[in-house]
Amino acid sequence: MRPFERVRTALAMWLARPVGVEARKVYWQRLAGGFVERYLSGPHILDIGYRGGNAQAVPIVPHAIGVDLDYPGYDGTRLPFADLSQDALFVSHCLEHIHDYRGSLADWYRVLNIGGYLLIFVPHKWLYERRAAPPSALNRDHKRFYTPGSLLAEIEESLPVNGFRVRHLADNDYAYDYERPIDRHPRGSYEIELVVQKIARPSYSHRLELPVGGPKDAKT
């Protein structure tokens, strides 16, 4: 899409779609900058936890299916969708509320097509919580605090070895007020952005999972 056409399309979508509160903060930038086009243009998209407590919220793109806890067949961990059926999953400010993060991450990976994208956004520990460890003073339902490193650690812990690639990882502090007192709710964006792409695991991948002290011919 040409830059002018992208901006025009982005403006129309930005005006028409009341997406979730956190996603809304940088929705225009992601639309106009090509982020949405790059990662969410496939025909089969899921927006997990899209309402975020706002009953009027809509999924991130018009053709996405919004999945919340009341979605038929969804138990909060396992999605009622077939293996290899989705081109992308958009998960904004949801993972930190999930106790069984391993189960959820593994299931999100399960439904992705080869080449599909898992987009995860979580509050940044030092931008949102601004404290070292739980409990959160701002949202008691937050099970864990995140830095980019700890988020990647959960991904590596939960997904198959050599079955994914990290395509994007960044701190999003757009319009963040660094001078706001620590006892006040932060303003602006305060999240970590992560995009993981599912790949076909190379034939040698099973050898990478062998424990230390395994067969002598195992190579890493």
Spans of features found by a protein language model:
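Short low-complexity stretches enriched in small and charged residues
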Residues: R2-F4, R17-R24, H44-I48, F121, ...
